Amino acid sequence: MTSKRKPRRRSLSPAKLDEMIEEATVDAYGESEQTVGFFTLLEERLKLPFKTEVLGVEVIVDRLDTTDDQQIVAVCSRGKSQQRVSILNLTLPDPPPEGAEWIEAFRRWARGR
């Protein structure tokens, strides 16, 4: 009996991620404006909603938002409950949603700041 697992999506090359970082941060001065650049691209390109898990519980990522201290968060819901989770810590489903490569690029940028 063979299992029909979908192949895992391969991570993008560092060079491709760097190109995406450049696209998100072009003409942005300072960390705050660069974060806004990423937020804008994530809103445009990340296909929402999608299901994932937070602390082992299935949730739906309904939208993105920013916090007062300029963090990008995913607004996750389960029933009537909502939780905001940093996009840096959000577990992505397998396969990831369309546009998830922008989360990967944002994470690379955030590690390098």
Regions found by a protein language model. Give the residues of each.
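Short aromatic-glycine-enriched beta-strand elements
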Residues: 68-75
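A short macromolecule-binding patch
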Residues: 81-90
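Long, low-complexity intrinsically disordered regions
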Residues: 3, 24-27, 100-113
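Short beta-strand-centered aromatic/proline hotspots
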Residues: 57-65
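A short beta-strand micro-motif
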Residues: 50-54
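Beta-strand residues in well-ordered beta-sheet regions across diverse protein folds
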Residues: 62, 75-77
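Mixed-charge, Lys/Arg-rich low-complexity intrinsically disordered regions
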Residues: 2-49
